[in-house]
């Protein structure tokens, strides 16, 4: 069950990614989902807190976009996640 968290969506080139930093029953985790390909670029990775999770998700998304088409990560608008 989700306790708290944030998420952001990126659309650049032909890519659509969702970045997550969330606290749940397993602890605080960061992840990145590729909406276009319907797979996880970075599945749940344990982090110390929500802010570190945001940083890790951004790093994974930035690396993926550079590798997949030399694309730059635009500025993000983080939104609060809904509780389950």
Enumerate the predicted regions with their spans.
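Mixed-charge, Lys/Arg-enriched low-complexity segments
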Residues: 33-84
């Amino acid at each position: 069950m989700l306790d708290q968290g944030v998420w952001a969506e990126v659309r650049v080139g032909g890519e659509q990614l969702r970045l997550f930093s969330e606290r749940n029953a397993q602890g605080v985790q960061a992840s990145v989902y590729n909406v276009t390909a319907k797979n996880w670029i970075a599945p749940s990775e344990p982090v110390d807190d929500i802010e570190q999770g945001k940083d890790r998700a951004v790093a994974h998304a930035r690396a993926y976009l550079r590798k997949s088409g030399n694309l730059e990560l635009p500025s993000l608008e983080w939104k609060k996640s809904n509780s389950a």
